[in-house]
A protein has these predicted regions:
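Intrinsically disordered, low-complexity, charge-biased linker/tail regions
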Residues: 1-3, 10, 66-93
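Solenoid-like repeat scaffolds
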Residues: 2, 25-35, 62-66
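Start-of-helix register in tetratricopeptide repeats
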Residues: 6, 36-39
Length: 93
């Protein structure tokens, strides 16, 4: 099984956690149409304050538009992506 950071969405999130917006954005752009990457893409645009663009990417990812704390959202995304990368399935995945 691949390590969690081997997934594009988690690699992008790791770049965002380092403050490397452009690197994170490039990763998700290269994986446009993959729901996990689209979710991180939405987060990135919300982080930069581009709420209209963020809303578009939340819709593409099949997610509700986030409105709460950015750090809490990032933690939620990380936990969900790590569950997925770990191969877990079911209602909590």
């Amino acid at each position: 099984m691949a390590a969690p950071s081997d997934t594009p969405a988690l690699r992008a999130l790791e770049q965002a956690e380092r403050g490397a917006f452009e690197a994170a954005h490039e990763i998700v752009q290269n994986h446009e149409g993959e729901p996990d990457c689209d979710w991180v893409h939405a987060y990135l645009h919300r982080w930069e304050g581009d709420h209209d663009n963020a809303a578009y990417w939340y819709r593409r990812a099949g997610r509700m538009v986030a409105r709460g704390d950015l750090a809490a959202e990032r933690a939620e995304i990380r936990a969900a992506l790590e569950r997925i990368a770990g191969g877990r399935t079911g209602p909590d995945a």
